[in-house]
Amino acid sequence: MAAGYPLRTMAKILVVADVAWVVNEVHAALTDPAHELVDHRDPATAADTALDEFADVVVVDLQVAAMGGMAVTRSVRDATATAVDPGMPVVLLLDRSVDVFLARRAGAAAWVVKPFTSHEMETALSRALNRRSPSPVASDQE
């Protein structure tokens, strides 16, 4: 659990990635039994699945399929936003720290750079769930 950002009990997390090692890395980082992880490989239906599964947060790989993580992030946020709520928070998994601008542009609530530690992922999740201002969490951040 990240200091300063207590995670709510029982968070349902939709993991959108089409590569097994990315899914495995997210699962390995999120070992807290308070997390319920739901894997989803089709980026085109991620927003509908997030709503159907009543997800609290969506974790999206930037390199997911042909659609890409930016488009998935926008799709989830657009499908879940209301006049008083900016939409379901998304944690974007980046390949390089220089891709932070992509996460900001897509409207991600938080992001981490692969490979990431369990602490970095928990911190990003906590920020997203608490709807904090976007802020990078990256192992190679300068």
What are these language model-derived features?
Residues 10-21, 26-27, 39, 58:
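Conserved acidic segment of CheY-like receiver
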Residues 34-42, 49:
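Short hydrophobic/Thr-rich beta-strand motif most characteristic of the beta2 strand and flanking loop
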Residues 56, 60-78:
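Conserved phosphotransfer microenvironments
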Residues 58, 111-112:
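Two-component signal transduction core modules
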Residues 71, 92-110:
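Alpha4 helix (beta4-alpha4-beta5 surface) of REC/receiver domains from two-component response regulators
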Residues 81-89:
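His-Asp phosphorelay/catalytic-motif detector in bacterial-type signaling
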Residues 116-125:
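C-terminal output helix
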Residues 126-142:
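The C-terminal output helix
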